[in-house]
């Protein structure tokens, strides 16, 4: 999703994504930008203790080879730079910087390269899969889930026939 919204917002620029990041199975703290909380709504209501924890503790679970290098935002007049504000970045195991958290400047579009849901829903514990399960990791996961649901509630669109759209009407194939 994160990579897709960058490609969609960036237009035909194929240099938005690169697939040489070494950040699979890699929990990281977020390197917040200077104005991360001052503009927009994504981080505005986050508690100070959680914000601080996200900046120093290894809470965000990264699972990607492809990503958006920070250099994709170097041209301040590019489509991607005019569409998104970078809220946080990271570096992979080799020191290569990538964009990790964005918020749309004009539209309620948000993206996170990491997987905050893994802390609450994946309980594998091993050196190979070091998913953080600390209280701050759980709070981070819940914060972003609550934020997303609250943003969805702002949409006044409704289904004409809600029953026909329920997941129970579809037979999953495994």
Where are these regions (language model features)?
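Amide-donor transfer/coupling interface in amidating biosynthetic enzymes
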Residues: 10-174
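Glycine-rich nucleophile elbow surrounding the catalytic serine of serine-hydrolase chemistry
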Residues: 1-7
């Amino acid at each position: 999703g994160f990579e897709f919204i960058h490609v969609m917002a960036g237009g035909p620029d194929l240099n938005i994504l690169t697939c040489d990041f070494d950040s699979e199975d890699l929990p990281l703290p977020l390197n917040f930008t200077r104005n991360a909380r001052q503009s927009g709504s994504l981080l505005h209501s986050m508690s100070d203790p959680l914000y601080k924890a996200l900046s120093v503790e290894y809470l965000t679970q990264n699972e990607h080879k492809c990503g958006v290098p920070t250099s994709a935002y170097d041209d301040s007049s590019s489509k991607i730079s005019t569409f998104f504000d970078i809220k946080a970045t990271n570096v992979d195991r080799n020191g290569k910087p990538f964009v990790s958290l964005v918020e749309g400047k004009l539209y309620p579009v948000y993206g996170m390269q990491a997987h905050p849901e893994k802390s609450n829903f994946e309980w594998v514990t091993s050196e190979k899969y070091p998913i953080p399960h600390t209280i701050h990791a759980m709070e981070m996961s819940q914060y972003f889930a609550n934020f997303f649901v609250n943003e969805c509630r702002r949409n006044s669109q409704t289904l004409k026939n809600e029953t026909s759209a329920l997941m129970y009407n579809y037979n999953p194939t495994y």
